């Protein structure tokens, strides 16, 4: 069996920084909570929980604790609320997400109507929207654009894990909605690279495994890209893999979301190796 692994795989730089900060604060404080799931991968959250990094529930309120802002960021009002209760706040927001928040606030302050191309209910988008005083417009579907009024000044930013191709399609449809339109490409370069690798894999393999959390936006987009071309399976746990998907002469593609740990790739390879001898290629 030939296995083609898209590189890079494992955590992106933003996820690495977020987890590193959480572990550092845990070592200093002995107890730490994250405001929502630190990253969108249940396996990773479970491992962090075992170490003592706990996820604070939506309706849970704590005082005088060490709290970490998740990688996707938070609305500023939420951060201010937890600060008011005497908590120490440590910001693990991905630097690229932070950049989008700053841009959104800048555009709002300079009288631009801010348009965010992204998923309405995604934590990152909710956080970005808060920096427009919730006056921005979120475009998730092309049908959302029909409702957009004409504005003298429009500023466009993107959820960092958006598909580049889909984002550009939406931008083209927005171009007649304003006189002055400023576009900031805030899609994460690492996300774009993985999307391109997914396209490349789809031309090589006859079955693909996308490894990562089912709640991960960037992982879902990798799945969509590959599934348009080849049989594709989104795998969150090893138990989900069915050996009947493979044959000895299969060409299997493996790609990971940005919050998928390296050791999960190794576990999947070990399982495949137990079925057939492997010939591994990096793509």
Curated annotation (Swiss-Prot):
Top EC category: oxidoreductase
Q: Which GO terms describe its molecular function?
A: 4 iron, 4 sulfur cluster binding; 4-hydroxy-3-methylbut-2-enyl diphosphate reductase activity; metal ion binding
Glycosyltransferase as UniProt keyword: no
Coiled-coil annotated residue ranges, if any? none
The domain of life is Bacteria
- List the pathway annotation: Isoprenoid biosynthesis; dimethylallyl diphosphate biosynthesis; dimethylallyl diphosphate from (2E)-4-hydroxy-3-methylbutenyl diphosphate: step 1/1; Isoprenoid biosynthesis; isopentenyl diphosphate biosynthesis via DXP pathway; isopentenyl diphosphate from 1-deoxy-D-xylulose 5-phosphate: step 6/6
The note describing how and how many cofactors are bound reads: Binds 1 [4Fe-4S] cluster per subunit.
Q: Where does (2E)-4-hydroxy-3-methylbut-2-enyl diphosphate bind?
A: 40, 72, 122, 160, 216, 218, 259
The record's listing under InterPro entries reads:
LytB/IspH
For this entry, the protein name equals 4-hydroxy-3-methylbut-2-enyl diphosphate reductase
Species lineage, top-down?
A: Bacteria, Pseudomonadati, Dictyoglomota, Dictyoglomia, Dictyoglomales
